[in-house]
Amino acid sequence: MARVRQATRIPVTAGQCEITSHGVRRLVDAGAVDFVNYDVSEGGGVTDWRRAAEICRAAGVRMAHHEESQISRELLAGVPHGTYVECFADPDRDPVWQAMWANRPRVRNGCMEVSREPGFGIQLDWKMVERYRIA
């Protein structure tokens, strides 16, 4: 992937399939990426995501995130090299994302508000949860 990055001026993003900050370090050390979109829910949680973010910051690589905008908006806002939140705000593309929040953040002009609530600021819509409950 480093050769692809060297052959183009198009920024390269990768990391959504990594499950640890060690995998992120390999991408960064190889010079393979301009952005890392390490997924906190697929990887080692918030602590490991922050570890990966520090690896990237030290190397001048920007952070993004793969999906889970309800979590990534807070993480990316908390690091100086955080960039974009991946969000499927179109109800036809992701109707569950539209319905799962009691306090869904506004997406306006391509930007999502960061919560002022404690933690991730997530308040689930329990009617929606009940509708999809299996047991």
Residue ranges, per PLM feature:
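Catalytic core of soluble alpha/beta enzymes
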Residues: M1-H66, A102
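Flexible C-terminal active-site loop/helix
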Residues: E68-A135
